[in-house]
Amino acid sequence: DADPQANATSGLGIDVEGVEMGTYELLEHTKTAKETIITTTSPNVDVIPAHIDLVAIEIELVDKDKREYMMRQAISDLKNEYDYILIDCAPSLGLLTLNALTAADSVMVPIQCEYFALEGLGKLLNTIKSVQKIHNPDLDIEGLLLTMYDSRLRLSNQVVEEVKKHFSEMVFETIIQRNVRLSEAPSYGESIIKYDASSKGATNYLNLANELMQKNKETV
């Protein structure tokens, strides 16, 4: 969890206030990745949690040599231990997100079906290009994921149309729709699959997982 808000941590049922070590210690290299891993109640899902100290990590890393590569170095030993390693990033383009992009094999870009999301998309894609050029030439864009879609809203439909018009080959076929059960699940510390596997939100994310796995299978 590379987001100081720690939503991925709490959403997996972990008490953020009780976290003693996590991504902060990992990036400071005071703990190894294996020392910071927590096993969650979701089958086959572990997490390196975030906690409040992560807010300060960008200031503390700024003067360090090769500061953009701290995460890549820290998680390198885990790559053969897991099928997938997901890095949840904050909705900002600071040093923490730069570390995640430098460490990643590919990036999935969520786009809320709202007006300002389109402005942020251009900035993010430019950042990704810079990372590819300077820090991580092997970084691929896995795809653009449209989220919080409501078919009843004109704006939602306009955003989908604009994104597909300009980035058609990059957009996932799966669209994550607005769903009450999706909003409720994190407050119970459960994934949407565990909370309500029959919900529209669960179906959307299962479709995304299948699409992602199929795409990777085709490119291997």
Locate the predicted segments by residue:
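P-loop NTP-binding core
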Residues: 2-220
